[in-house]
């Protein structure tokens, strides 16, 4: 599992070493550049390495576990130094970013030959090309292709009680903003899970807010409050959008403007003056999506398990997408279930169409597999970090979009007409940038380098001038081979070779024993000695130097032409950025929709009926993750019904669920919450039938964990989460509560649970499932008109308990705790003693009975005898050794009679 992003800000010194008069030109340049980026590690390009110096080197060597060396002196002290290779620096960047560092990447911006023209001691010009931070990553090697990487900004103005929260995915251009009440901030941050969060320094004064932000998991970047000033932000936004007024994009609150302005400033800062191709900002209303707080998301294991793993989460169980963009769209839908029934049903219409059109679904998914990630390729091109492969991704993505659109347009007449959701996506793709796609396909070669500077990415025949220059370059290389043969023949040295490196250029190389021959007449007149090595001597000639010059000119000119063509193609692509972004979104949505249809067909899910009622009727509901896990082992999940609807459930919108541990209460609670989320994200659900009235807020208090960092016990955490539910839940909410009040004294816990149920019933009036071991609460069904009792069915057999995992009306008559403890393997004396204590408590419960129990404890009487060794019967021994899969019917019947005889003998 990858390391999570942290809110730790590494200490990088803001006061840097002064530049002494005797500093080398290189070190003087380094210190000058570092002074401009004091809070980041500086990757200083030195040839094929990025080198770090001073405290940067100390911090990086420790974080990366690489060698710390030294290079020269500063003010009489050794300068610490470490470095990483340029060709593999992405891996080191990723590790530093995940440990909370920011990295300023400083590149050489001129050729060393140009620097030498200014003087022998001139240093190559360098400049920071970008600031790499957790929220501004664009490279595929640094990103998860199947997850968004949001940079968010939080703002609050004195005149407004709430917050403005803006977010952008620099790698795709997604840009949005919303206004939030303070109580809703945690839920929204949990939904977005940003990689980095910008906030004004003044917000640190709010201790409760600081604690909430620290829990978000995002790297926190504090900026001067002036960066969030709404007037300045509005001007910045208008300039970015190229408009004189923002009315066409929505009526933004001051806090929203401040957050968006800070985002744009920070993106431009980190990209050193360049801006990615961002979509126009969309304003998201808090009521558009189901509110799910951080605790509920964690308890329900929506995107990762409680152990932090992706496998075993709801997202991993549901994901059938075939593209990275489709996976991101699916994750976004799961994170933000919709609350508008019409919007949800449009999604369900599209899923149903693909569900029924099996052949078209298979054809579409096969076509999508060849669709690259247009959005991320476009972002890299807009930031000047794109390469030939990004242009090819655009071309191939457009080709896939056009092909899929044609396939959908030509769908079989036997199918229903395209639903609105699919027709809209098709319209976004139809004919998009067709001329650009044709041009890119014609210009690009089949085999493409990663970087444009490597050349060779323009197809032969695409540019006559380039073809001519390449021919000259390639012919010159043939002349080199001919010249080598000529020199070998003239000198009689068969081992003579003409080689090339970046220092000497082309040179003649011979073994040392033949070198003396070339140093003596008559060869010394034409062969000029260049270098002596341990195992070779190197020479040149005027003829070779002239030919090398022509080759260099031809090769340089060919690369120059290719780079110019690349710039032309990139510029033409960026002109189509808006339509390309729409096509990329359409492909992602089609992938997510078809994937949900594939899942529904594979797992026998059904379309839920979703409307504006207060219904919550599930027939044959199943837990999607548990069902999938059981299916892998050949087991079946036991389905259960739920009815929390005032309309059809006899007015019972709260169920009080009792039953033993291990009987399936928590699974039942969670499965209903997950079914609600799946339905409102626009997915079919694991049930035989489902009718759900829109849920506006989902609350879950399931499981137990302490919060030692903030001085909170398990019980305190439980009470804080319960308080949030009781203070925020409403009539449209769905509440899942498990074992409220168990972390304190029995009567205290019972009292809290009792009062909580009454409050949910009379004040919140929410649809709720309340699991408890306090059987006394079942009496509330006689007092509260909208509460019903339900229990997990069990059977007892020969003193053991068998869990049926079935929910039935009524209340449990006992908890079966001792039987569960026995299953867990508690020692036999402990089980026996527990049974006797329970019997005594059930008989009376008065003070004298409890005193007698204490007097009977082994501590005050005699040490308990060890449990007798369990004798294994002959029948049990026989059962242990048999393999059912190897028995024929006749053998099985004979064995049955044998076991019966052994059992009878054992019982004597």
Curated annotation (Swiss-Prot):
This is DNA mismatch repair protein MutS. It comes from Parvibaculum lavamentivorans (strain DS-1 / DSM 13023 / NCIMB 13966). Gene3D superfamilies: 1.10.1420.10, 6.10.140.430, DNA repair protein MutS, domain I, MutS, connector domain, P-loop containing nucleotide triphosphate hydrolases. This protein is involved in the repair of mismatches in DNA. It is possible that it carries out the mismatch recognition step. This protein has a weak ATPase activity. SUPFAM superfamilies: DNA repair protein MutS, domain I, DNA repair protein MutS, domain II, DNA repair protein MutS, domain III, P-loop containing nucleoside triphosphate hydrolases. ATP binds at residues 659-666. Keywords: ATP-binding, DNA damage, DNA repair, DNA-binding, Nucleotide-binding. Pfam families: MutS_I, MutS_II, MutS_III, MutS_IV, MutS_V. The keyword ATP-binding applies. The keyword ATP-binding applies. InterPro entries: DNA_mismatch_repair_MutS, DNA_mismatch_repair_MutS-lik_N, DNA_mismatch_repair_MutS/MSH, DNA_mismatch_repair_MutS_C, DNA_mismatch_repair_MutS_clamp, DNA_mismatch_repair_MutS_core, DNA_mismatch_repair_MutS_N, DNA_mismatch_repair_MutS_sf. The gene is mutS. Belongs to the DNA mismatch repair MutS family. SMART domains: MUTSac, MUTSd. GO terms for biological process: mismatch repair. GO terms for cellular component: cytosol. GO terms for molecular function: ATP binding; ATP-dependent DNA damage sensor activity; damaged DNA binding; mismatched DNA binding.
């Amino acid at each position: 599992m990858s390391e999570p992003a942290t809110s730790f800000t590494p200490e990088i010194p803001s006061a840097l070493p002064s530049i002494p008069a005797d500093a080398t030109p290189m070190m003087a340049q380094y210190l000058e550049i570092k002074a401009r980026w004091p809070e980041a590690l500086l990757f200083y390009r030195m040839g094929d390495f990025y080198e770090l110096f001073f405290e940067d080197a100390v911090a990086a060597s420790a974080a990366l576990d690489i060698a710390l060396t030294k290079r020269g002196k500063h003010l009489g002290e050794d300068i610490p130094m470490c470095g990483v290779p340029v060709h593999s620096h992405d891996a080191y960047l990723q590790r530093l970013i995940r440990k909370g560092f920011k990295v300023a990447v400083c590149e050489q911006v001129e050729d060393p030959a140009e620097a030498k023209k200014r003087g022998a001691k001139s240093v190559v010009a360098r400049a920071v090309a970008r600031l790499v931070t957790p929220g501004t990553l664009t490279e595929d090697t640094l990103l998860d292709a199947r997850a968004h990487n949001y940079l968010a900004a939080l703002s609050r103005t004195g005149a407004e009680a709430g917050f403005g929260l803006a977010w952008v995915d620099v790698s795709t251009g997604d840009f949005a903003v919303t206004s939030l009440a303070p109580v809703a901030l945690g839920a929204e941050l949990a939904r977005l899970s940003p990689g980095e969060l910008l906030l004004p320094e003044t917000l640190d004064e709010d201790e409760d807010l600081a604690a909430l932000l620290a829990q978000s998991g995002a790297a926190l970047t504090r900026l001067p409050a002036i960066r969030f000033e709404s007037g300045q932000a509005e001007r910045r936004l208008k300039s970015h959008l190229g408009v004189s007024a923002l009315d066409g994009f929505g009526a933004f609150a001051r806090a929203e403007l401040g957050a968006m302005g800070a985002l744009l400033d920070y993106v431009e800062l980190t990209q050193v003056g360049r801006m990615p191709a961002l979509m126009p900002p969309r304003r998201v209303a808090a009521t558009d999506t189901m509110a799910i707080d951080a605790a509920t998301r964690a308890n329900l294991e929506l995107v990762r398990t409680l152990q932090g793993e992706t496998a075993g989460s709801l997202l991993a169980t549901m994901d059938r997408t075939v593209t990275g963009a489709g996976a991101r769209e699916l994750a976004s839908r799961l994170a933000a279930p919709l609350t508008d029934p019409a919007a949800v049903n449009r999604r369900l219409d599209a899923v149903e169409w693909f569900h029924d059109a099996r052949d078209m679904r298979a054809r579409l998914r096969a076509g999508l597999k060849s669709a690259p990630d247009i959005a991320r390729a476009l972002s890299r091109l807009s930031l000047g970090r794109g390469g030939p492969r990004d242009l090819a991704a655009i071309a191939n993505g457009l080709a896939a979009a056009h092909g899929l659109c044609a396939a959908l347009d030509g769908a079989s007449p036997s199918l229903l007409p395209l639903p609105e959701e699919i027709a809209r996506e098709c319209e976004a793709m139809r004919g998009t940038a067709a001329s650009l796609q044709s041009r890119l396909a014609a210009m690009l070669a089949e085999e493409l380098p990663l970087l444009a500077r490597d050349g060779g990415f323009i197809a032969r025949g695409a540019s006559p001038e380039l073809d001519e220059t390449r021919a000259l370059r390639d012919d010159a290389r043939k002349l080199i081979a001919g010249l080598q043969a000529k020199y070998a023949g003239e000198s009689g040295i068969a081992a003579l070779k003409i080689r090339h490196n970046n220092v000497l250029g082309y040179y003649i190389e011979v073994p040392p024993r033949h070198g003396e021959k070339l140093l003596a007449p008559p060869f010394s007149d034409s062969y000029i000695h260049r270098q002596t090595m341990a195992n070779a001597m190197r020479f040149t000639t005027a003829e070779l130097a002239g030919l090398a010059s022509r080759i260099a000119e031809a090769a340089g000119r060919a690369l120059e032409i290719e780079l110019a063509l690349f710039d032309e193609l990139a510029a033409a692509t960026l002109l189509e950025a808006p339509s390309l972004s729409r096509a990329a979104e359409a492909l992602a949505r089609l992938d997510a929709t078809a994937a949900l249809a594939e899942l529904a067909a594979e797992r026998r899910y059904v379309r839920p009926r979703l409307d504006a009622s207060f219904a919550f009727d599930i027939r044959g509901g199943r837990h999607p993750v548990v069902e999938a896990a059981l299916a892998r082992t050949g087991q079946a999940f036991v389905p259960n019904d739920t009815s929390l609807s005032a309309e059809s459930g006899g007015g019972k919108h709260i169920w009080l669920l009792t039953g033993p541990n291990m009987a399936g209460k928590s699974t039942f609670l969670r499965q209903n919450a997950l079914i609600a989320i799946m339905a409102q994200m626009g997915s079919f659900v694991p049930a035989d039938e489902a009718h759900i009235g829109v849920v506006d807020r989902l609350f879950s208090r399931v499981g137990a964990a302490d919060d030692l960092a903030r001085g909170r016990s398990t019980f305190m955490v439980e009470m804080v989460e319960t308080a949030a539910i009781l203070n925020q839940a409403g009539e449209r909410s769905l509440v899942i509560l498990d074992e409220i009040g168990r972390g304190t004294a029995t009567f205290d816990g019972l009292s809290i649970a009792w009062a909580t149920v009454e409050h949910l019933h009379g004040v919140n009036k929410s649809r709720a499932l309340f699991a408890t071991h306090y059987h006394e609460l079942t009496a509330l069904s006689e007092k509260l008109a909208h509460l019903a009792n339900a229990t997990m069915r069990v059977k007892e057999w020969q003193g053991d308990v068998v869990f049926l995992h079935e929910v039935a009306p009524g209340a449990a008559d006992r908890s079966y705790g001792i039987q569960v403890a026995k299953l867990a393997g508690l020692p036999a004396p402990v089980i026996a003693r527990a049974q006797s204590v329970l019997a005594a408590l059930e008989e009376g419960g008065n003070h004298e009975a409890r005193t007698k129990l204490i007097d009977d404890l082994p501590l005050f009487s005699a040490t308990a005898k060890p449990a007798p060794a369990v004798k294994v019967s002959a029948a049990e021994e026989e059962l242990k050794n048999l393999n059912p899969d190897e028995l024929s019917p006749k053998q099985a019947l004979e064995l049955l009679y044998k076991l019966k005889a052994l059992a009878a003998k054992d019982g004597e």
